[in-house]
């Protein structure tokens, strides 16, 4: 867990991260329940589309993730991918920016909670579609998909965003 503060010492956010080791396991016992999010059985309230820039992984590289899979085409081709993949923090940041623009535009300080599951890597150059269902006052569900192949596996799924509705 990490906490971020503004230059005047005001608390901005708390960041919790969890790693999922997909092919690890075998510890015995029952599997924990999946952290699933229920989506409303209706059309989404909002949709935001944007192309993920080819140079965005270079922008996120200074965040500390120096792995070759984000910038080295020859490396990623050896792993079976057609091109480098986006940083997870970048993909989540794009979804967060979309949510702010759609739900409480101009008031990023209103966000109190963002949670999502990374379910597929974003390839730079892909057109993203963030789909949002408002589920209550200051609460929404979202997922991010490939706008050109919306039936494919989502990039981000089980998304929750919450905000202080008194601010926005």
Tell where the protein language model's regions lie, with residue ranges.
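HotDog/MaoC-like acyl-thioester-processing domains
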Residues: 1-48, 124, 131-168
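Histidine (H) residue identity feature
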Residues: 11, 67-70, 87, 98, ...
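Catalytic strand-loop segment that frames the active site of acyl-thioester-processing enzymes
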Residues: 19-86, 100
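Hydrophobic beta-strand-centered segment that forms part of the acyl-chain substrate-binding groove
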Residues: 91-135, 139
């Amino acid at each position: 867990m990490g906490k971020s503060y503004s230059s005047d010492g005001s608390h901005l956010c708390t960041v919790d991260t969890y790693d999922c080791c997909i092919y690890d396991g075998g510890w015995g016992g029952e599997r924990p329940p999946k952290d699933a999010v229920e989506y409303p059985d209706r059309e989404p309230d909002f949709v935001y589309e944007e192309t993920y820039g080819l140079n965005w992984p270079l922008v996120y590289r200074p965040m500390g993730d120096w792995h070759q899979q984000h910038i080295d085409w020859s490396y990623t081709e050896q792993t079976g991918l057609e091109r480098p993949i986006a940083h997870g923090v970048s993909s989540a940041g794009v979804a967060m920016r979309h949510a702010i623009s759609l739900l409480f535009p101009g008031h990023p300080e209103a966000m109190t909670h963002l949670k999502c599951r990374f379910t597929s890597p974003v390839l730079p150059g892909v057109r993203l579609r963030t789909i949002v269902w408002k589920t209550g006052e200051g609460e929404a569900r979202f997922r991010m998909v490939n706008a050109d192949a919306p039936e494919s596996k989502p990039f981000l799924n089980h998304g929750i965003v919450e905000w202080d509705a008194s601010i926005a």
